Amino acid sequence: METSSFENAPPAAINDAQDNNINTETNDQETNQQSIETRDAIDKENGVQTETGENSAKNAEQNVSSTNLNNAPTNGALDDDVIPNAIVIKNIPFAIKKEQLLDIIEEMDLPLPYAFNYHFDNGIFRGLAFANFTTPEETTQVITSLNGKEISGRKLKVEYKKMLPQAERERIEREKREKRGQLEEQHRSSSNLSLDSLSKMSGSGNNNTSNNQLFSTLMNGINANSMMNSPMNNTINNNSSNNNNSGNIILNQPSLSAQHTSSSLYQTNVNNQAQMSTERFYAPLPSTSTLPLPPQQLDFNDPDTLEIYSQLLLFKDREKYYYELAYPMGISASHKRIINVLCSYLGLVEVYDPRFIIIRRKILDHANLQSHLQQQGQMTSAHPLQPNSTGGSMNRSQSYTSLLQAHAAAAANSISNQAVNNSSNSNTINSNNGNGNNVIINNNSASSTPKISSQGQFSMQPTLTSPKMNIHHSSQYNSADQPQQPQPQTQQNVQSAAQQQQSFLRQQATLTPSSRIPSGYSANHYQINSVNPLLRNSQISPPNSQIPINSQTLSQAQPPAQSQTQQRVPVAYQNASLSSQQLYNLNGPSSANSQSQLLPQHTNGSVHSNFSYQSYHDESMLSAHNLNSADLIYKSLSHSGLDDGLEQGLNRSLSGLDLQNQNKKNLW
C-alpha cells in the first residue's frame, strides 16, 4: 500500500518523505556497523581489500538478496519497509569524494540523482551515501548497474532505502510538525509589526480621507479662514500622503521648524532626499529580546490609535523632513491621552502651545538648537551673567574694582583729549574762606559728583567768574539760586598728612547720604542722588593712588595760605589741581553735550558699590530739581520724595540691603 502510494506520488512529495527519513533510520546504523567491521579485516600489507570471517558470509547473503530484488519486475509489489525512489550506497572507499562518485555514475550513463549526500558519523566519513531519484525506474536502473561495481578495490553495495517502523515514523513526523509550527509562529509574530508598517505606508496614500476625518472638525473650528493657508494646517492634512511620497514630501509641505524657512536650505533638503530615496536601506531583523513592550493601556486595534502611532513613528525616524509635529489643541481628551502615552513610549517631547500640541524629538543638534533659541529670543537665558551686569554684582565684587579703574582711566583719557583740542581760555579759581572752610566743587559734564560737606570742613560753593562758564552753566547750575546755609564748623587740629587722610575717610561714615551714591547715576541738574544712604560701607576705599578723581569740571576754592589747604584737603586732591586752560576746556564745551554723551564715573572711592558702569541717570527723578542744596543734604529719602525713584532704580543691585529702615546701623 505504501509502495503504490509512493509510486503515484509526485516527486516533491517523495522528496519530502525521503528527506524526513534520511538521517533517522536503523538501517543506516546497521550499515555503518557492517562497514566498520569489514574495515577491521582489511589486509593493509598487500594493499588489497579482502573480506574474511562472518562479514563475507553476510555480504554474500546481501548480494543474493540484492540480485533477487533486481531480478524482480519493477511494477511488482516491493517490500513494505523500503522507499522505491531512494537508495543507500555502502562500502564506498574513504578516499573517494562525493564529486568523484557522481562522475563515475555519469560516466556509466546512469541517471543522476536530484539529491545526493554523504553520511558523516561525528564528522567522519564511514563510506555511506544516500541518493534520491525522481522515478522508481531510475532507481531500479541505478541499483542494477551500480551494485557490485568495484571502485578502488572495493565493491559497492547499493540497495533500496528502508523505512522506519510506523510508530517511529509517526513520532518523527509529529515532532517535525511541532517544530515547524513553532518556527513559523515565531517568524510571523516578529514580522507582523514590520509588515503592517510597510502595508500602511503603501496604502496611506489611498486612505487620506481617514486621516482628514480625524481632524477635519477640529481644524474647521479653529479660525478656519486663517488656518486654511497656514503651513501647519497643510502639514496635518497632507501628513498621510507625505508618508508615501518620499520624493515629493518637502515640495508639497512647508517645514514646521523655524530653522528651515530659507528657500535655499529648503531646496537642498529636497535634493538630498531625492538622492537618498534611491539608496538601499538594510533593515535590521527584529528580535523579541530587544523589542520594547508596547504600552498596555492603549488598544492598537483602534484605528485612531494606529493612525497616531504611525504618524509619531514616522516623525521620529524621518528627522530630515521636519522638526516638529503639530496637533490642534482642540482634540478630544482620549486623543490627548493617546498622544501622551505614545510620546513617552517613543521617546518624544510634548510642548503645549496656545493652539497646538507640538511634538519634538529629544535629540537636537547644537547648531539647530542655537538657531532656534536665537529666533525665539531665548539666548540670554542660556548665557551666564557678565561682569558688567548689575544682577551679578553681588557675587562679582572683585571684578567691579577693576571696572571702576578702567572706566576712570577712559574718562581721564577723554579729558586729556578734550583739553588738547579746545582753545585756551583762563578760568579763575577763587577762594571763599570767610569762616575758614575750604570750598571744593566738582561737576561733570555727564553728571554731578556728590557734594561733600563734612560738618563744616568741606562744602561745595560754585564760583564762576569766566563769562563763557556762566553762559554754559546758567541753565544747569546757578549759585544765586542756592541759598547759603550756615555750615557747622569744627576746630582745626594739627595732624600729619596720613592722619588727615584717615580722618577724611572716617568722616564719610557721618556724612549725609549725599556722599553715598555713585556719581554716574544722577542727572547734571542738581545733586538728586546725594541723599542715598544705600552704599554698603563708606569706610572702606581703594588706595588713593588707584582712585582717579572725577575732575571734569573742577572749581576748587583755595585758601589764602597754601599750608592751610594742604592741612584740610586730603592728599588725594592735592596733586589733582588743573590749570585754568584745562578747567575751561573741561567746563565749556562739554557742558553743551551733557545730554547726548554720558561718561561713566567712579563711585566716590567705595569698593562695595553695586552700580555698574551703565547706570547713568533716571529721567523720572528729575522732578526733584526744585529742592535746594540744604534740603538735598539734610532731608531723608521719605521727606524729599525720592524714596520710590531710588528704590526702583537700585533694588536690582542692592537687594541685600534694607531700604526701609534708614536708621539701621551698618554691620560691616
UniProtKB/Swiss-Prot annotation:
Residue ranges, annotated region (Disordered): 1-77, 168-214, 374-398, 420-570
GO biological process assignments: DNA damage checkpoint signaling; G2/M transition of mitotic cell cycle
InterPro entries linked: Nucleotide-bd_a/b_plait_sf, PIN4-like_RRM, R3H_Cip2, RBD_domain_sf, RRM_dom, RRT5_SRSF_SR
UniProt effect for mutating residue 305 to A: No interaction with RAD53
Keyword tags: Cytoplasm, Phosphoprotein, RNA-binding
Cellular localisation: Cytoplasm
Entry comment on modification after translation: Hyperphosphorylated in response to DNA damage by MEC1.
CDD domains: R3H_RRM (cd02639), RRM_PIN4_like (cd12253)
Subunit structure: Interacts with RAD53.
Protein name in the entry: RNA-binding protein PIN4
